[in-house]
Amino acid sequence: MYCSMPDGEVENKLQDVIDRKILDTRRVFFSEPVTDKSAADAIKKLWYLELTNPGQPIVFVINSPGGSVDAGFAVWDQIKMMTSPVTTVVTGLAASMGSVLSLCAAPGRRFATPHSRIMIHQPSIGGPITGQATDLDIHAREILKTKKRIVDVYVEATGQPREVIEKAIDRDMWMTADEAKDFGLLDGILFSFNDL
């Protein structure tokens, strides 16, 4: 008797096996925009690794165009609370909130692959903005607070003066991995995971 599974089930089972194998190596891949869902998925995986083997290193691989600041800082805060040392590795792209996530590792643990790109900029509000003047003023003050938090992260991570960071993020600032290293966003360029 022959029993076949629908293609979707086969793909899902294969994806589960791949995800399990990767998690067994204590690697978490974040290869999507930063959303509430992607942040929650990453946090669950990170905490699974933390709880199953506390204090053992975790590699957080980032390839993200950025996205939600709040969701990104949720991941950031969780990583900072763990006992397991986290190493970040940018591969492909870490833009906007993705670049902030790449800095959640302790100094000496922030890397990128040779052809990666990093983009930093100030936060923005998407879509048309409508509402009463008072509400718009509240939103404007909130985005300025968010900008300050992001500037604080970049200043602490890079050691650059606040004025340099504020000027750098005034518009999109694109960097190669080497340029990001020179700017202080990375500690090194990673040519092999064996180098970790």
UniProtKB/Swiss-Prot annotation:
Enzyme Commission (EC) number: 3.4.21.92
CDD domains, per the entry: S14_ClpP_2
Record's subunit section: Fourteen ClpP subunits assemble into 2 heptameric rings which stack back to back to give a disk-like structure with a central cavity, resembling the structure of eukaryotic proteasomes.
Main subcellular localisation: cytoplasm
UniProt name for this protein: ATP-dependent Clp protease proteolytic subunit 2
GO biological process, one term: protein quality control for misfolded or incompletely synthesized proteins
Taxonomic lineage from the root: Bacteria, Pseudomonadati, Chlamydiota, Chlamydiia, Chlamydiales
Species name: Chlamydia felis (strain Fe/C-56)
InterPro entries, per database record: ClpP, ClpP/crotonase-like_dom_sf, ClpP/TepA, ClpP_His_AS
Active site: 96 (nucleophile), 121
TM ranges: none
UniProt similarity note: Belongs to the peptidase S14 family.
Catalytic activity: Hydrolysis of proteins to small peptides in the presence of ATP and magnesium. alpha-casein is the usual test substrate. In the absence of ATP, only oligopeptides shorter than five residues are hydrolyzed (such as succinyl-Leu-Tyr-|-NHMec, and Leu-Tyr-Leu-|-Tyr-Trp, in which cleavage of the -Tyr-|-Leu- and -Tyr-|-Trp bonds also occurs)
Annotated PROSITE patterns: CLP_PROTEASE_HIS (PS00382)
An annotated GO cellular component: cytoplasm
GO molecular function: ATP-dependent peptidase activity; ATPase binding; serine-type endopeptidase activity
Alphabetized UniProt keyword annotations: Cytoplasm, Hydrolase, Protease, Serine protease
Protein location: Cytoplasm
Signal peptide: none
